[in-house]
């Protein structure tokens, strides 16, 4: 009987809809976002190295506020060693209410490595709901495919 209740509890927990966490409000942040320009997989070869799978990555920045605009002031792409590879913005970009933008790292671009990242800086005139900042890392060739997201994380105030 106890097993039946545990099983029922597990089914109910898995079947119930997930509750979204409320978004915080902020007037600006620096957001760290992981990027995977490649991942290691498979078995080690004769040189004790795994195989490398190249991925493309799309950075998505989404203004979640239905009433206020935000300004994306900087989108910088760094490699595994923390070296700046590319500054994606030449000038600040305004995102209106509920608007989105994206940046793309090509499949053939493996310069970032397994520890690549974006630093995204944004600001608003006053506190707005925090944007969603994430990457979609993907590999789609023939019958094989792989895709996963990496969530951005706001850094402590004053971090750049």
Model-flagged regions — what are they?
Residues 79-117:
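Intrinsically disordered, low-complexity Pro/Gly/Ser/Thr-rich segments with frequent PxxP/GP/PP motifs
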Residues 109-160:
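Terminal connector regions
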